[in-house]
């Protein structure tokens, strides 16, 4: 085993990591053995067959900062299942080779450090990794070929997602896909760009090739590698069954060509229509605007979950964040609203003392006003903005989770596949809307939404609000917009602005007046 001449690096005034003594230390020897053991295991899994694939691990030493720790790397072009501990390369943190394996007799080729070396070093540099695995597992190759144009692999609602760092069962796991090249080292820039654009990822797929996976330690990298390969295999098998692995309910794959007709022009055929036995098939507008309460989400969720949470936590929130610019802005808006309420004689409005009266007195008055506003279900910006900030804390602390009807995710996915833009218009703040759809009982649905509107564009029962929306969503005519709501007065206002409007009928919604004149639906799947 040859040791290359390299500058010795002193760590904390102790042993030099590039010294011969350190290269022969127990930590280095144990890491050599570990890599050879893992390569045999990975060979049996099909990850490193045909001399392909590789693994690298940093030599863990508590006395040495991770960026300065030695790197052990398997060689290239060798039978991975037959490697011995002495076959490993030892590199300094900057990538210079400190020790290389001795040549073996014919038919073995001369030793060569892994072709993956530059990519391994990039993962160490950008992700502070402790180990990196490069797999040629068949499943990691096939998932990139199912959709040859896709730049991402996505999957959600699978138990093994929990094994990926920073992810849970309801989360959407996204793995970037980069294009393969003739030589491994040519992938380095693409890998770096993917890591930069996907800061949460711990893996990058290479189309028609394999995957790079890293972790804080060899255990983390190995565990995640096993989970990634499981999820890829699951996606392939779901695809074979005609099921969509990327959606929460893993329903049937929506074949867009079959849905819109393979012999028809997409621009005209996407108007799939509104199915209503009383009115026949109507053409679907270019974009859809959805209300939340009673349309996508049960009214009870807002009334029985969100409002009580805001009411019960307003005091705690104001005390904890009183000095922040955000909360001071909230207080300023509330002051203006309360002053207007007092001038108009609104019941239960309480004068808010000036700031110099003391934090406790100001907060007590704010709490009294906010509780009264919530009780009266007032649709005012000052209240909605503060509620959004309170709810944000609840969602971040996993104390809140959005609820949508079972038909909502599939409908959103279908419209998204057809290129139909979908917006939300609610009396709740845009922040609150993003929170509700960002963490639902079906995962993150924001990827299907093009934007959010709140009362800053106007009251939902005023026609001018819908005129403002129609001028913001990029349609040629207001009639190209379909507005879905459970409130007749809102439908009337939308119709007055030239929008198409339908009424959502859900359990718990308020009864509709007779002869209201609008189409009705019981599920978004009817659109």
UniProtKB/Swiss-Prot annotation:
Source taxon at top rank: Eukaryota
GO molecular function: acireductone synthase activity; magnesium ion binding; methylthioribulose 1-phosphate dehydratase activity; zinc ion binding
Residues at which Mg(2+) binds: 291, 293, 486
Residues holding substrate 1: 116
Note accompanying the cofactor annotation: Binds 1 zinc ion per subunit. Binds 1 Mg(2+) ion per subunit.
Region described as Methylthioribulose-1-phosphate dehydratase: 1-244
Active site (catalytic residues): 159 (proton donor/acceptor)
SMART domains given in the database record: Aldolase_II
Reactions the enzyme catalyzes: 5-(methylsulfanyl)-D-ribulose 1-phosphate = 5-methylsulfanyl-2,3-dioxopentyl phosphate + H2O; 5-methylsulfanyl-2,3-dioxopentyl phosphate + H2O = 1,2-dihydroxy-5-(methylsulfanyl)pent-1-en-3-one + phosphate
Pfam families for the chain: Aldolase_II, Hydrolase
Region described as Enolase-phosphatase E1: spans on this chain: 288-527
Metabolic or biological pathway: Amino-acid biosynthesis; L-methionine biosynthesis via salvage pathway; L-methionine from S-methyl-5-thio-alpha-D-ribose 1-phosphate: step 2/6; Amino-acid biosynthesis; L-methionine biosynthesis via salvage pathway; L-methionine from S-methyl-5-thio-alpha-D-ribose 1-phosphate: step 3/6; Amino-acid biosynthesis; L-methionine biosynthesis via salvage pathway; L-methionine from S-methyl-5-thio-alpha-D-ribose 1-phosphate: step 4/6
Cofactor(s) named in the record: Zn(2+); Mg(2+)
SUPFAM superfamilies per the UniProt record, alphabetical: AraD/HMP-PK domain-like (SSF53639), HAD-like (SSF56784)
CDD domains assigned: HAD_EP (cd01629)
Keywords recorded for this protein, A-Z: Amino-acid biosynthesis, Hydrolase, Lyase, Magnesium, Metal-binding, Methionine biosynthesis, Multifunctional enzyme, Zinc
Annotated Zn(2+) binding sites: 134, 136, 209
Family assignment from sequence similarity: In the N-terminal section; belongs to the aldolase class II family. MtnB subfamily.
Protein's recorded name: Probable bifunctional methylthioribulose-1-phosphate dehydratase/enolase-phosphatase E1
């Amino acid at each position: 085993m040859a040791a290359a001449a390299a500058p010795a690096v002193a760590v904390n005034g102790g042993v030099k990591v590039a010294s011969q003594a350190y290269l022969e230390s127990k930590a280095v020897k144990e890491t050599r053995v570990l890599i050879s053991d893992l390569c045999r295991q990975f060979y049996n899994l099909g990850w490193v067959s045909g001399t392909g694939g590789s693994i690298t691990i940093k030599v863990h030493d508590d006395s040495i900062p991770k960026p300065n720790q030695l790197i052990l790397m398997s060689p290239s072009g060798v039978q991975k299942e037959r490697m011995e501990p002495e076959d490993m390369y030892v590199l300094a943190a900057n990538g210079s080779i400190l020790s290389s394996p001795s040549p073996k007799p014919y038919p073995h080729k001369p030793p060569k450090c892994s072709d993956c070396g530059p990519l391994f070093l990039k993962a160490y540099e950008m992700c502070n990794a402790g180990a990196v695995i490069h797999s040629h597992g068949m499943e990691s190759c096939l998932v990139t070929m199912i959709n040859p144009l896709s730049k991402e692999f996505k999957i959600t609602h699978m138990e093994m997602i929990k094994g990926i760092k920073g992810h849970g069962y309801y989360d959407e796991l996204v793995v970037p896909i980069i294009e393969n090249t003739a030589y491994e080292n040519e992938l380095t820039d693409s890998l770096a760009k993917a890591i930069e654009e996907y800061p949460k990822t711990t893996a990058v797929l290479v189309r028609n090739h394999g995957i790079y996976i890293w972790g804080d330690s060899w255990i983390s990298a190995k565990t995640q590698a096993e989970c990634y390969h499981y999820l890829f295999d699951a996606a392939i098998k779901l695809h074979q069954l005609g099921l969509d692995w990327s959606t929460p309910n893993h329903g049937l794959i929506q074949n867009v060509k079959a849905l819109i007709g393979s012999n028809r022009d997409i621009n005209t055929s996407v108007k799939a229509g509104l199915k209503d036995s009383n009115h026949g098939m109507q053409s679907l507008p270019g974009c859809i605007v959805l209300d939340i309460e009673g349309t996508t989400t049960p009214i009870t969720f807002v009334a029985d979950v969100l409002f009580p949470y805001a009411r019960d936590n307003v005091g705690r929130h104001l005390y904890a964040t009183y000095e922040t610019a955000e909360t001071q802005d909230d207080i300023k808006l509330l002051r203006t609203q309360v002053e207007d309420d007092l001038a108009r004689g609104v019941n239960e409005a309480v004068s808010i003392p000036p700031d110099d009266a003391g934090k406790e007195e100001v907060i007590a008055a704010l709490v009294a006003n906010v509780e009264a506003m919530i009780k009266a279900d007032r649709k005012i910006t000052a209240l909605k903005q503060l509620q959004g900030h309170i709810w944000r804390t609840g969602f971040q602390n996993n104390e809140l989770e959005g609820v949508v009807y079972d038909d909502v995710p599939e409908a959103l996915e279908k419209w998204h596949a057809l290129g139909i833009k979908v917006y939300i218009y609610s009396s709740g703040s845009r922040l609150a809307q993003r929170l509700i759809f960002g963490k639902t009982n079906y995962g993150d649905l924001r990827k299907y939404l093009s934007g959010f509107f709140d009362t800053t564009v106007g009251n939902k029962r005023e026609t001018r609000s819908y005129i403002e929306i129609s001028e913001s969503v990029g349609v040629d005519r207001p009639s190209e917009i379909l507005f879905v709501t459970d409130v007749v007065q809102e439908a009337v206002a939308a119709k007055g602005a030239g929008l198409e409007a339908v009424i959502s009928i859900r359990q718990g919604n308020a009864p509709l007046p007779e002869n209201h004149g609008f189409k009705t639906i019981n599920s978004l799947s009817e659109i």
